Design a protein with these regions (language model features):
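N-terminal strand-loop element at the rim of the active site
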Residues: 11, 15-79, 158-163, 244-245
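A conserved mid-protein helix/loop that constitutes part of the nucleotide-sugar donor-binding site
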Residues: 26-34, 206, 210-229, 245-251, ...
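Short His-centered aromatic/hydrophobic patch
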Residues: 97-103, 123
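A short, active-site helix/loop in glycosyltransferases that binds the activated sugar's phosphate group
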Residues: 148-172, 179
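Nucleotide-activated donor-binding/catalytic signature segment of Leloir-type glycosyltransferases, i.e.
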Residues: 251-267
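Aromatic "clamp/platform" in nucleotide-sugar-dependent glycosyltransferases that forms part
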Residues: 285
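Short hydrophobic beta-strand element within catalytic cores of glycosyltransferases
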Residues: 302-305
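Conserved acidic donor-binding segment of nucleotide-sugar-dependent glycosyltransferases
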Residues: 317-328, 336-342
Length: 379
């Protein structure tokens, strides 16, 4: 869709929009807000109030404007959100929406208030819904794809999907993982493991770590299916860090099936969890550029993951990939890696090497700046 850039006012003003987020989208927007502000742009971030509490947009050099963009459509909530976005877009040189809900409402707000303002959309997720919901989401995706000036896909499959839905311009826009936060205190692997394992577990018990929202996309039930096949003295302890709507069901399975697994809840000490882990597992139905995968490989922790979405291109040969939805294959891969010290050492060494091939936060910000320049003709 052709747009005439907004009249320049000296300083380029980028408005970043997101819906509720407790994962990679919020982290990425925080990184962009900080990087763009450092390059001299005026940056406004629009999203639910809790996202500022989680990610500290206000402390990134950006102005934060609360806009309650709900996870699901609602006539009243959407109308209110569109009204707030119209006001936030009043001086915008460009709007950059992250995710489908944010993109749809941003498009509506621009069409009724600032039709000449370019719209960039970063696509972070695949449509994994079924039935009527899938068809409705596809209609929304098609509208966004056709109306946005540019779609940036976090993985190659998302770029291909945007093009199939009618996007005139769709490009790869990798989402870089931020550096792992510094440890709050220097603790040894043994000290962290002792805290996590407790007094009832052997000190050398293998630890399998999984991190993410407890939602169907992450498919932690597949990990529990695999864990049900690990019995005996070398059975690993599965630690799952995260929170979400599937928490009750997962906890119920762990208890009823007597699985050697534990839910840790939301954690901010991923660096220490990685220090304690012998292996990281991603059991997802789909991922783009998984932050957990990036963190594991950077930290030199062996990774076993499902071969879905953007994961194969992200990890290359530095991780073990298994078919999605196959608990037997997942269980076998985990057991094989845990049983082979040499293989673990190979994967641990390959991870940081693979990570060197990824764009860092500075490169990601530079790409976005280039896109903004192209669409606005400024700077």
């Amino acid at each position: 869709m052709e747009h005439t850039p907004a009249a320049p006012t000296g300083q380029l003003h980028a408005v970043l929009v997101l819906a509720g987020s407790s994962g990679g989208i919020g982290t990425h927007v925080r990184s962009l807000a900080q990087g763009l502000s450092a390059h001299g742009l005026e940056v406004t971030v629009c999203g639910p109030a809790e996202t500022d509490e989680l990610y500290g947009f206000s402390g990134s050099g950006a102005r934060f404007q609360p806009v309650e963009i709900t996870p699901t459509p609602g006539p009243r909530t959407d109308a209110a959100a569109v009204g707030e976005l119209r006001r936030a877009f009043a001086r915008a040189s460009l709007v950059h929406a992250h995710g489908l809900r944010a993109a749809l409402l941003s498009d509506l707000a621009l069409r009724t208030a600032r039709a000449g303002t370019p719209l960039v959309v970063t696509s972070h997720h695949a449509n994994l819904a079924t039935g009527v919901e899938r068809r409705l989401l596809r209609l929304m995706e098609r509208r966004v794809a056709k109306n946005a000036d540019l779609i940036l896909g976090a993985s190659s499959d998302l770029v291909a999907r945007a093009r199939s839905l009618g996007a005139a311009d769709a490009r790869l826009g990798p989402v870089a993982a931020p550096p792992l936060p510094a440890a709050t205190a220097e603790r040894s692997r043994e000290a962290v493991r002792k805290e996590l394992l407790g007094s009832k577990e052997r000190a050398d018990r293998p630890v399998v770590l999984a991190v993410g929202r407890l939602v169907p996309q992450k498919n932690f039930h597949l990990l529990l299916d695999a864990a049900s096949g690990w019995r005996g003295g070398e059975e690993p302890l599965v630690l799952i860090a995260g929170e979400g709507p599937e928490q009750g069901a997962l906890r119920g399975r762990i208890k009823s099936e007597k699985l050697r697994a534990r839910l840790l809840g939301r954690r901010s000490d991923v660096r220490e969890l990685l220090l304690a882990a012998d292996l990281v597992v991603i059991s997802s139905r789909w991922e783009a550029r998984s932050l957990v995968a990036q963190e594991a490989l950077r930290a030199g922790v062996p990774l076993v993951a499902t071969a879905v979405g953007g994961l194969p291109e992200l990890v290359g040969d530095a991780a073990v990939l298994v078919p999605p939805g196959d608990p037997t294959a997942l269980a076998a891969a985990v057991s094989a890696v845990l049983a082979d010290e040499g293989r673990r050492a190979e994967l641990a060494a390959a991870g940081p090497v693979q990570a060197e091939t990824w764009p860092d936060e500075a490169a990601t910000v530079a790409q976005v700046l280039s896109v903004y320049d192209e669409l606005t003709g400024e700077r």
